Amino acid sequence: MANIKSAIKRAELNVKQNEKNSAQKSAMRTAIKAFEANPSEELFRAASSAIDKAETKGLIHKNKASRDKARLSAKLVK
């Protein structure tokens, strides 16, 4: 455990941020799974939006976001 006051505060903030990031990533994965279970234009937009939000917040790399959206788009076209 940290001894310095600022380090203790940062550790607490890191825990909160980790929970927030995990929730955001989970929401993204849930949106993707919902689309894959039942491909539709509406679910594609929701999944694409979730991916973009995760990319903007730095949770996933921009290339991964692009790759994921391309794969979802290909499934929508089929």
Curated annotation (Swiss-Prot):
Biological process terms in GO annotation: translation
Lineage top rank: taxon: Bacteria
GO cellular component, one term: cytosol
Keyword Transport: no
Entry annotated with the keyword Ribosomal protein: yes
InterPro entries in UniProt: Ribosomal_bS20, Ribosomal_bS20_sf
Role played: Binds directly to 16S ribosomal RNA.
Family: Belongs to the bacterial ribosomal protein bS20 family.
Protein name: Small ribosomal subunit protein bS20
Organism ancestry: Bacteria, Bacillati, Bacillota, Bacilli, Lactobacillales
Gene assigned in the entry: rpsT
